[in-house]
């Protein structure tokens, strides 16, 4: 979570702390990039999607980020339509967000980021409130953005659904890198080793 907050600029903009080292996005020091520019490049899906909602209805929420880019209404409508088609969530259109299940809320949070077409996606514990079907759908969405050449950074304890998608798995313990694995190397770890690391 801390790393995702560093990459999206929430640290040090909104969360204080001592930072040692540098965080670079596209070769630029993150602390030198205005938040509006970071938001155009980096999309974040938080562990609890309710904390990132600004609207009551799903279509307005999906359009919120691109609306702030001052796109014409026709372009907004087209992008919302394209987003819901790409992510197969047409059935969630024009719904009250607060009547959705946890998994459906997560899909809307992801869709609102996807609509902005960022180069970098940050997801914080995205599977934590999802059932098996929703986790499979999340994996499909991640596969889609990976095919589009996007960079995806995920903070997660459940890794089983990511092992075929991940290029690299970085294991952190108390803020220190304890291991870097390819997907294949991670699959070779025993169940005992993964449990000892607190991973599933």
Label every PLM stretch briefly.
Residues 16-28:
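Conserved ABC transporter NBD signature motif
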Residues 74-92:
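Conserved ABC ATPase "signature" region
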Residues 96-100, 104:
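Conserved ABC ATPase signature
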Residues 110:
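Hydrophobic anchor residue at the start of the ABC signature
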Residues 121-124:
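Catalytic Walker B motif of ABC-type/P-loop ATPase nucleotide-binding domains
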Residues 156-157:
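H-loop/switch region of ABC-family ATPase nucleotide-binding domains
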Residues 176-199:
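Conserved beta-strand-loop-alpha-helix hinge in the C-terminal portion
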């Amino acid at each position: 979570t801390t790393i995702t907050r560093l990459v999206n600029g929430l640290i040090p903009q909104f969360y204080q702390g001592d930072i040692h080292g540098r965080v670079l996005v596209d070769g630029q020091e993150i602390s030198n990039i205005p938040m509006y520019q970071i938001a155009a490049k980096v999309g974040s899906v938080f562990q609890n999607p309710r904390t990132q909602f600004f609207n009551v209805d799903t279509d307005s929420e999906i359009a919120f980020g691109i609306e702030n880019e001052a796109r014409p209404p026709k372009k907004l409508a087209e992008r919302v339509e394209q987003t819901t088609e790409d992510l197969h969530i047409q059935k969630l259109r024009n719904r009250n967000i607060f009547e959705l299940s946890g998994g459906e809320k997560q899909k809307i949070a992801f869709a609102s980021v996807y609509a902005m077409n960022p180069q970098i996606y940050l997801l914080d514990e995205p599977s934590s409130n999802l059932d098996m079907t929703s986790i499979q759908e999340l994996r499909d969405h991640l596969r889609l953005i990976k095919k589009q050449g996007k960079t995806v950074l995920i903070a997660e304890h459940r890794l089983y659904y990511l092992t075929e998608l991940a290029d690299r798995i970085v294991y952190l313990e108390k803020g220190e890198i304890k291991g870097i694995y390819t997907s294949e190397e991670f699959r070779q770890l025993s169940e005992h080793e993964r449990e000892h690391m607190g991973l599933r």
